[in-house]
Amino acid sequence: MIREGRVSIASRIVREPEHPTLETEADIRVDGQHFAKPVSRYLMLNKPRGLVTTTHVERSRDTVYRCFDDSDMGWIAPVGRLDKASEGLLLFSNDPQWAARVTDPATGPSKTYHVQVCGIPDDAALHRMRQGVQDQGERLTAVSARMLRVGERNAWLEIVLGEGRNRQIRRILQALDFEVLRLVRVSIGRVALGELAKGAWRELSADEVAALVGD
């Protein structure tokens, strides 16, 4: 479309797809008609275990987009990620600027997880999680780690992260010799998963959208 000369910016034909412009500030037209900016969408999904988090639909793998099969909302992308074996709160949006603010490791919101582990961590192990462990040349720490409930052979922990490194919780627990049985993200900042059913999604409220970027 662009290379065919059908797109103009500020009354000038543009043929380079990577031509820099700010969509909100330029007069963009396609075939002489004003380009309508898509409505911004902000969603939360209760991701089921076993689905791959990816930025596009793939026929060869079972991805999170399966949960949106019955909807017609246009392009959206995950904001952050959960690995295939993890479940819980996953955000989606078609607003890349908002997504970048949410996922900024320096200023983005904290993330809270409920984690079932094989074995019973003692106070010293919980302290190590907060103090940090070394793994693959990285120091991995939790903002907080506390016991939720204890069974005969396993326990549920609540772990809060201030930054999201790849498989961070699994790596911390592996370094302390605990096997992760389940890992569920229950909140991001002040936005909680609540009673949203597994595999279901809903729109974020305006207050939730603002809260996730500190507005």
Show where each model-derived region lies:
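Basic, flexible Lys/Arg- and Gly-enriched helix-loop patches that mediate nucleic-acid binding at interfaces
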Residues: 1-215
